[in-house]
From Swiss-Prot:
Catalyzes the reversible conversion of 2-phosphoglycerate (2-PG) into phosphoenolpyruvate (PEP). It is essential for the degradation of carbohydrates via glycolysis. Binds a second Mg(2+) ion via substrate during catalysis. Its EC number is 4.2.1.11. This is Enolase. The active site is at E205, K343.
Length: 434
């Protein structure tokens, strides 16, 4: 009765109006699962391949019909007959069927859509919530959210090099309260921006994209919003930055060229100067987490940054690790970064995603489950965050349904868990010594 009988993919749209995949899996019993695949804007060089059609006459070349066909005509016939509960077996079978190191033949988007749909169908078959199916009986930790309320870099047209300015309500007693705090700060920030005559349009991830006078202006405005909402910066609510440094690193000159986003007169920094600048920000503001502070291929820079700041701030590898255990293992061995960002579509299966989270935890690194800038209404990452007791999630601002869908799912899970639910707040930053 738990045998897979049908697999079907279709092309749908993501939050940017670009095509992506939706996959459905059915079993003999009638159990059903559906998975939708996200897409990134600032993508790591070593990410698994997102298969696009390349036909400029259709969706500007971004169509996903090839990936859809790979699901319907190649993957389906290989996994029909599998027990839907055999997640690892199905994921490994698809990896073998693809046969490339980066899933470039079938497409990570095709494989991931099936992987998610299989897990959801198995949960449906067993009549349990997805987080419970994936995580087992000890599933209980609600993640501390990193809420991206200012969008810069490749996520907006704002002239700021850093891609995300986040609030982290680590002082809240529950996830529900953390979400409330975040929403109140978001609205306080909007009011402040309006009073300054700045734009309140939002970027890809639901955060505002105003024309600030540089990074410090952005951080200080967020601090004012935290205080205006009635909270204490550095006690109730902390700040996080996603530098997305690979987006403005000049590999030929070996410099971090802020002029790419901030225009003429902006800083151009060496690796050493970039580290000095990040340390200056950490010493000046209540920053608890920095993502991709160095370029994805600047291993010496990452090691130096970690040696300098690794005890007092979370240093998250996104483009640096691309949710890949091979890169994470190297980072652990070389003491580079102290945290990994987890994006399911960077690697392409749930099995490999869980492997990366487990490896990080065993090494004392934190794992931050994350959305992509091109999202859908699929809320699987909320269930993954709870299933793995990861402790942290990054899923955008307090606007746009593609972001709110994940927050609302976490509210449901917290309700379902009842008294068992734990919100660890600052304790979820167990990689820090301060």
């Amino acid at each position: 009765m738990s045998i897979i009988t049908d697999v079907y993919a279709r092309e749908v749209l993501d939050s940017r109006g670009n095509p992506t995949l939706e996959v459905e899996v059915y079993t003999e019993s009638g159990a059903f699962g559906r998975g939708m695949v996200p897409s990134g804007a600032s993508t790591g060089e070593h990410e698994a391949v997102e298969l696009r059609d390349g036909d400029k006459a259709r969706y500007g070349g971004l169509g996903t019909q090839k990936a859809v066909d790979n699901v319907n005509n190649v993957i389906a016939e290989h996994i029909i007959g599998f027990d839907v509960r055999d997640q690892q077996g199905i994921d490994r079978a698809m990896i073998a069927l693809d046969g490339t190191p980066n899933k470039g033949k079938l497409g990570a988007n095709a494989i991931l859509g099936v992987s998610i749909a299989v897990a959801r169908a198995a949960a449906d078959y067993l009549e349990v919530p997805l987080y419970s199916y994936l995580g087992g009986f000890n599933t209980k930790v609600l993640p501390t959210p990193m809420m991206n309320i200012i969008n810069g870099g490749s996520h907006s047209d704002a002239p700021i090099a850093f891609q995300e300015f986040m609030i982290v309500p680590a002082g809240a007693p529950t996830f529900k309260e953390a979400l409330r705090w975040g929403a109140e700060i978001f609205h306080a920030l909007k009011k402040i921006l309006k009073e300054r005559g700045l734009e309140t349009a939002v970027g890809d991830e639901g955060g505002f994209a105003p024309r600030f006078d540089g990074t410090e202006d952005g951080v200080e405005t967020i601090i004012k919003a935290i205080e205006a909402a009635g909270y204490v910066p550095g006690k109730d609510v902390f700040i996080g930055l996603d530098c997305a440094s690979s987006e403005f690193y000049d590999a030929e000159r070996k410099v971090y060229d802020y002029t790419k986003f901030e225009g003429e007169g902006a800083a151009v920094r060496t690796a050493a100067e970039q580290i000095d600048y990040l340390e200056e920000l950490v010493n000046k503001y209540p920053i608890i987490t920095i993502e991709d502070g160095m370029d994805e291929n600047d291993w010496d820079g990452w090691k130096a940054l970690t040696e300098r700041l690794g005890d007092k701030v979370q240093l998250v590898g996104d483009d640096f690790f691309v949710t890949n255990t091979a890169y994470l293992e190297k980072g652990i061995a070389e003491h580079a970064a102290n945290s990994i960002l987890i994006k399911v579509n960077q690697i392409g299966t749930l099995t490999e995603t869980f492997d990366a989270i487990e490896m990080a935890k065993e090494a004392g690194y934190t794992a931050v489950v994350s959305h992509r800038s091109g999202e859908t209404e699929d809320s699987t990452i909320a269930d993954i965050a709870v299933a793995t007791n990861a402790g942290q999630i990054k899923t955008g601002s307090l606007s746009r349904t593609d972001r709110i869908a994940k927050y609302n799912q976490l509210l449901r899970i917290e309700d379902q868990l009842g008294e068992v639910a734990e919100y660890r707040g600052l304790k979820s930053f167990y990689n820090l010594k301060k």
